[in-house]
Amino acid sequence: MSSGLDPAIAARLKRTPDGLVAAVAQQRGTGEVLMMAWMDDEALHRTLTTRKGTYYSRSRQQYWVKGETSGHTQHVHEVRLDCDGDTVLLVVDQVDGACHTGDRTCFDADVLLAES
């Protein structure tokens, strides 16, 4: 599938063998980490052009826009590429829960280590 992603951006991405990069969503203003999902070039292109968090579902093998069904949308303010080129950071305004469970973040449920 051809993507509309700027070739200069595409050239900087280091993808998995499946052609994906990790995408981390972070709440604007607080820095709270909300979720991690996957993007391919087209999902990143759609995110950059619409300012809506758009991801690629590995299980369904299709694109999804955060909040399209639930109403829990993400308005994207910034997109940053990490130093290795294998992860993008989306700085967003999240409406309601970011997690598909309804929790604010996908990292609320299982604390493996905490301050004692």
From Swiss-Prot:
Q: What is its EC number?
A: 3.5.4.19
GO cellular component entries: cytoplasm
Q: Where does Zn(2+) bind?
A: 83, 99, 106
Q: Which cofactor does it need?
A: Mg(2+); Zn(2+)
**Which chain regions cross the lipid bilayer?**
none
Q: Which domain of life is it from?
A: Bacteria
Where is this protein found?
A: Cytoplasm
Q: Where is the signal peptide?
A: none
Biological process according to GO: L-histidine biosynthetic process
**Co-factor: note:** Binds 1 Mg(2+) ion per subunit. Binds 1 zinc ion per subunit.
Q: Which InterPro entries match?
A: PRA-CH, PRib_AMP_CycHydrolase_dom, PRib_AMP_CycHydrolase_sf
In terms of Pfam families, this protein maps to: PRA-CH
Please tell me where this protein is predominantly located: cytoplasm
- Quick one: which residues bind Mg(2+)? 82, 84, 86
List the keywords (alphabetical).
Amino-acid biosynthesis, Cytoplasm, Histidine biosynthesis, Hydrolase, Magnesium, Metal-binding, Zinc
> Quick one: which pathway?
Amino-acid biosynthesis; L-histidine biosynthesis; L-histidine from 5-phospho-alpha-D-ribose 1-diphosphate: step 3/9
GO MF entry, a single one:
magnesium ion binding
Q: Which reaction does it catalyse?
A: 1-(5-phospho-beta-D-ribosyl)-5'-AMP + H2O = 1-(5-phospho-beta-D-ribosyl)-5-[(5-phospho-beta-D-ribosylamino)methylideneamino]imidazole-4-carboxamide
- NCBIfam families in UniProt: PRK00051.1
Q: What does this protein do?
A: Catalyzes the hydrolysis of the adenine ring of phosphoribosyl-AMP.
Q: How does it assemble?
A: Homodimer.
Which family is this protein grouped under? Belongs to the PRA-CH family.
Tell me what this protein is called: Phosphoribosyl-AMP cyclohydrolase
What is the source species? Answer: Saccharopolyspora erythraea (strain ATCC 11635 / DSM 40517 / JCM 4748 / NBRC 13426 / NCIMB 8594 / NRRL 2338)
